[in-house]
C-alpha cells in the first residue's frame, strides 16, 4: 500500500490534480480573505513605522545640525569676546602706562620748576646782597671822599682800595 501511495504521488491522476488545484484555490481564497488583509496591514504599519523612524532620524539629524551650528556660533562669540577682553586689557595697560609716564613727566617738570625757582630766589638773594654790599662800599667811599677833599689821583686811589677790599667770590 505504501508503494501504491508512493506510486500515485509520482504519477498523479487527473482527479488528483483537479482536487489539488481546487484545494490550492480554496487555500488562496482563505488566505486572501483572512490572511492577506492582516499581512498587508502589518506590512503597511511596518512601512509607516520605518518611515516615521526615518523621519524622526532626519529631524534628529537636523536638530543636531542646528545645535552644532548654535554651538559653533557660541564658540565664535566666546572667542570674539575673549579677543575683545584681551584688546581692552592691552588698551587699559597701555593707557595706564601712558598716564604713569605723563604723571612722572609732570612731577619731573614740577621738580625742575621748583629747582629753577629756588635757584632764581638764591640768585636774587645773592644779587640783593651784592647790591647792598656795593651800596655800602659806595657810601663808605663817598664818606671818605667827602671827609678828605681829595684831588683826582687821591680819589682814584681810594676807589681802587675800596674795590680791593671787595670780596671776589
Curated annotation (Swiss-Prot):
CDD domains: ATP-synt_Fo_b. It is found in: Cell inner membrane. Residues 69-107 are annotated as: Disordered. Residues 87-107 have a biased composition (Basic and acidic residues). The keyword Transmembrane applies. One of its GO terms (cellular component) is proton-transporting ATP synthase complex. It holds the Pfam family ATP-synt_B. InterPro entries: ATP_synth_B-like_membr_sf, ATP_synth_b/b'su_bac/chlpt, ATP_synth_F0_bsu_bac, ATP_synthase_B_chain. It is a single-pass membrane protein. One of its GO terms (molecular function) is proton-transporting ATPase activity, rotational mechanism. The chain crosses the membrane at residues 12-32. The keyword Oxidoreductase does not apply. Keywords: ATP synthesis, Cell inner membrane, Cell membrane, CF(0), Hydrogen ion transport, Ion transport, Membrane, Transmembrane, Transmembrane helix, Transport. Its main location: membrane. HAMAP family: ATP_synth_b_bprime. NCBIfam families: ATP_synt_b (TIGR01144). F-type ATPases have 2 components, F(1) - the catalytic core - and F(0) - the membrane proton channel. F(1) has five subunits: alpha(3), beta(3), gamma(1), delta(1), epsilon(1). F(0) has three main subunits: a(1), b(2) and c(10-14). The alpha and beta chains form an alternating ring which encloses part of the gamma chain. F(1) is attached to F(0) by a central stalk formed by the gamma and epsilon chains, while a peripheral stalk is formed by the delta and b chains. F(1)F(0) ATP synthase produces ATP from ADP in the presence of a proton or sodium gradient. F-type ATPases consist of two structural domains, F(1) containing the extramembraneous catalytic core and F(0) containing the membrane proton channel, linked together by a central stalk and a peripheral stalk. During catalysis, ATP synthesis in the catalytic domain of F(1) is coupled via a rotary mechanism of the central stalk subunits to proton translocation. Component of the F(0) channel, it forms part of the peripheral stalk, linking F(1) to F(0). Belongs to the ATPase B chain family. This is ATP synthase subunit b.
